[in-house]
């Protein structure tokens, strides 16, 4: 996961 993923959320972070 990246910083952007964390900001967007876990669901999107998994992608």
From Swiss-Prot:
Keyword Hydrolase (UniProt): no
UniProt cofactor note: Binds 2 calcium ions per subunit. Binds 1 heme b (iron(II)-protoporphyrin IX) group per subunit.
Ranges in coiled-coil conformation: none
GO molecular function terms listed in the Swiss-Prot or TrEMBL record: lactoperoxidase activity; metal ion binding
Single Gene Ontology BP annotation: hydrogen peroxide catabolic process
Catalytically driven reaction(s): 2 a phenolic donor + H2O2 = 2 a phenolic radical donor + 2 H2O
Metal-binding found in the keyword field: yes
Keyword annotations: Calcium, Heme, Hydrogen peroxide, Iron, Metal-binding, Oxidoreductase, Peroxidase
Transmembrane segment boundaries: none
Cofactor: Ca(2+); heme b
UniProt-listed Enzyme Commission number(s): 1.11.1.7
Function of the protein: Removal of H(2)O(2), oxidation of toxic reductants, biosynthesis and degradation of lignin, suberization, auxin catabolism, response to environmental stresses such as wounding, pathogen attack and oxidative stress. These functions might be dependent on each isozyme/isoform in each plant tissue.
Family: Belongs to the peroxidase family. Classical plant (class III) peroxidase subfamily.
Protein name per Swiss-Prot or TrEMBL: Peroxidase 3
Record organism: Daucus carota
């Amino acid at each position: 996961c990246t910083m952007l993923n964390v900001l967007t959320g876990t669901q999107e972070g998994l992608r």
